[in-house]
Amino acid sequence: MKCLLCGQTMKAVLTFSSLLLLKNDDSCLCSDCDSTFERIGEEKCPNCMKTGLSTKCQDCQFWCKEGVEVSHRAIFTYNQAMKDFFSRYKFDGDFLLRKVFASVLSEELKKYKEYQFVVIPLSRDRYADRGFNQVESLVDAAGFAYLDLLEKREERASSSKSRSERLETEFPFFIKSGVTIPKKILL
């Protein structure tokens, strides 16, 4: 098997449990590439997961004053390796990369069994450009079902906007007509 990021050949490691359960090791990365992704540690904002803090960050304090409670969960820091991953996955359309975080995401999503997963949609233009919805593909690869409740207005891509432009953008999503909204939703 080859690493999905660097193409290096990886040796298959057979374990007793993988033989007994007839499961393959689902690692898609070599140890070198895997080590470039940094998990978020204990020092983080409890609301948005911004690293290096142990209390609510300034952004979350601002949103809280505005009446918006931020509840974001992240597993990894957004370092250069993650930026490169998302560039290849989203902008280059490397569909195979959906498998890279499938097992990690699967373990994390198990914590939210009582929630219904709702995937943020792409605009029609963005879907046509990319050929697939990246979040749908990640959730599928992790083995979870999701609800299709939202639509998106056409607008300029978020990736082409500055941070201040993104913060000033009107919410581009709306609920499809005739759908039932579950009580607990995970976006």
Question: Where are the predicted features?
Answer:
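Glycine-rich phosphate/pyrophosphate-handling loop used in enzymes and phosphotransfer proteins
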Residues: M1-L187
